[in-house]
Amino acid sequence: MYAHFFVEAAFPDQIITWTIAFICAAGAVMSMVGDLAASAIKRNHNIKDYGKLIPGHGGIMDSDCTDDVFSCHSDDWTALVPKVRYKEHSTMKKIAILGSTGSIGTQTLEVVRNNPELQVAALAAGKSVEQMEQQIREFHPLIAGMWSEEAAADLRSRVADLPVKVVSGMDGLLEIATMPQSQVLVTAIVGMIGIRPTIAAIEAGKDIALANKETLVTAGHIIMPLAAKMGVKILPVDSEHSAIFQSLNGEPAGRIEKILLTASGGPFRGRTREQLQNIQVEDALKHPNWSMGRKITIDSSTLVNKGLEVMEVKWLFGVDLDQIQVIVHPQSIIHSAVQYVDGAVIAQLGTPDMKLPIQYALFYPDRRPMPGKRLDFYELAQITFEKPDMETFFGLKLAYDAQRIGGSMPTVYNAANEKAVGLFLDRKIAYLQIPELIREAMEQHKVIENPNVEEILETEASVYDFIEKVYSERQ
């Protein structure tokens, strides 16, 4: 058609006619390119990776108009640029929070305060009855849980005037995890106590906002396949894993060359073992950047927390252990990054505020406004990076060793650390004994390949007994 149009064109209208024809032809070519691009993107959705579990990792996008991934026609030249965005949701989202009185739990409730689209369906805590009562009166959950029945009985008497069901123990956690009124379970609970409720919630079809490291560290081989089977989302809440999640931006695992996991280095960065001989509890609880709970603050100082995060990264994003590189970044501005096979590095930056990854997980795939301090690049004096000192802080190296061995060894690493940190917080052992006890527990353990939940919990109990025995013998 276009060739015939050119032949019959006569000067002086020829230039105009040729121009019109060229525009028409260009439009046809652009349309063909758009169809091919849309087809390619749709084919990309079929890539089998962790996109089904980590929704931003191979997620489905939607356009401004029809099913076409390109935006509608406009007189503005920017309409030629492909525009993709996620659908926004304005409906009420109901959440249940395990560990509502802890650091992550209370910050999650701050996010709820600022977002009327979020509603609390249930809360659970350990023993902070007074704080739980305050939360119930403010957020009006249907169910509230306490770990001990004694604490639950106290809470029932305090909130007898309110229409809330108070439950206790593991049965209570399981009831909250599976309640039909909630859509998302926030696992902000500390320790391996979170494994069973997380599994139950996944089996009930709940999306998981994951802040409980122990769940994936000890049972990642159970959790991730189950999540894939049930088609639920695992949404990371830890700042580093959220940063990786955001930096992936839908890229499949095959395009990842390396994951750069940042660490602040803790309060003792740069110190020698000799300088750590007399560290007291108060010293270790002074984190330079983040406001966190007591145990995780100690873990950050020993770099064991980073070791646990390495294990999480492996399970969350389906990468090999050798693809995970820990980088000490004292300013905690770059929360983590992804290096791709073409050499490009994409990172997520921001102020050290846990509410940002919490809110991102709860509203994913939307981004919502959030009050708070913004990152001001003019005020940044410097951004520096260092290699972690794995000789002084060898708890991080032990994490790599435990994950390479696999099976029940990550459970040993986690349980030994939990018990050792507890002894340190009780002022029963020295600071440097924490990683030493972890190493001893790993050396004496006979690995169980592919352990089930019961074997994981039995391993935890046996490690606790071992650490207690070692401690008693050395008194």
Residue map of PLM features:
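Catalytic, metal-anchored helix/loop core of enzyme active sites in primary metabolism
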Residues: 92-475
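Hydrophobic alpha-helical transmembrane segments
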Residues: 1-90
